[in-house]
Amino acid sequence: MLFDQIARNKRKTWLLLLVFFLLLGLVGYGVGYLWLGSGFGGMILALVIGFIYAVTMIFQSTNVVMAMNGAREVDEQTAPNLYHVVEDMAMVAQIPMPRVFIVDDPSMNAFATGSSPKNAAVAATTGLLAVMNREELEGVIGHEVSHIRNYDIRISTIAVALASAITMLAVMARNMMFWGGGRRRNDDDRNGSSGLEIILLIISLIAIILAPLAATLVQLAISRQREFLADASSVELTRNPQGMINALLKLDNSAPMQHHVDDASAALFINDPKKESGLQKLFYTHPPISERVERLKQM
């Protein structure tokens, strides 16, 4: 099952690229048409920027994501308990030893990043290390190592990178629309536009408004099932379902993280780092803890 999931994740990587670059292209077309005088020129520029940003994030994802979350790298001497658990789980999973980081935050959470098992990293908060016992910590780290082994991290990294690029470009475009201006404003230009240009303009303007939401929904579409698989894979590594269940129950009672967590990188964490409520729950990247626990009990 795991090998099939790895193959599916690789296919999803290309599907994600197509969807996100389509959104980038549509937003870029609107910006280019209205402010650069060339819709297709804006589309090409947006795609080039998005491609460079995505490639940079993929190959620099570990350093970028760790810096965004204020993580510091540790080793066997500075954090022996965490280091040894990561080492053990990586050995069982038969992947290279990931780099190990700690985030100074009293909440309980952990995440992994990196484009492949060869350049991955695992991070845990000080709150998690203070509360979890050895079996629970193994469950959490096993979950993160499973993300690495199943190539979930590559999908998440691409989603984080391109969702951030789309959101940034869409926000810039909306600000430009709000303040007015632009080079493509006169009637002569508009009267000379072809029907295809008008249709693309309308679609791109809609994309400018909806792109951040669409990018979030794409992340949601792949994130929740990925969490279920990582929970099950962690139990496969530890042979201790109760340890994973106990860890999830403790995570469910954890407070939100105190430091700011970027919306795009929130999906990387084992538990929702913001603990939002109300309608915002509709956009959770993680399934409810209670549902995750029930699935583990059925194993």
From Swiss-Prot:
**Which Pfam families does this UniProt record tie to the protein?**
Peptidase_M48
Which keywords, in A-to-Z order, does the entry hold?
Answer: Cell membrane, Hydrolase, Membrane, Metal-binding, Metalloprotease, Protease, Transmembrane, Transmembrane helix, Zinc
Needed cofactors, names only, are:
Zn(2+)
Give the active-site positions: 144
Q: Where in the cell is it found?
A: Cell membrane
**A GO term for molecular function:** zinc ion binding
Q: What is its EC number?
A: 3.4.24.-
Residues annotated as transmembrane: 14-34, 39-59, 153-173, 198-218
Membrane topology, as annotated, equals: Multi-pass membrane protein
Name its GO BP terms in alphabetical order. Answer: proteolysis
**Cofactor: record remark:** Binds 1 zinc ion per subunit.
| Annotated binding of Zn(2+), by residue | 143, 147, 227
Q: Which InterPro entries match?
A: HtpX_protease, Pept_M48_protease_HtpX, Peptidase_M48
Q: Got a GO cellular component term for this one?
A: plasma membrane
* Protein family (similarity comment): Belongs to the peptidase M48B family.
This protein's name: Protease HtpX homolog
Originating organism:
Streptococcus thermophilus (strain CNRZ 1066)
The top of its lineage is:
Bacteria, Bacillati, Bacillota, Bacilli, Lactobacillales
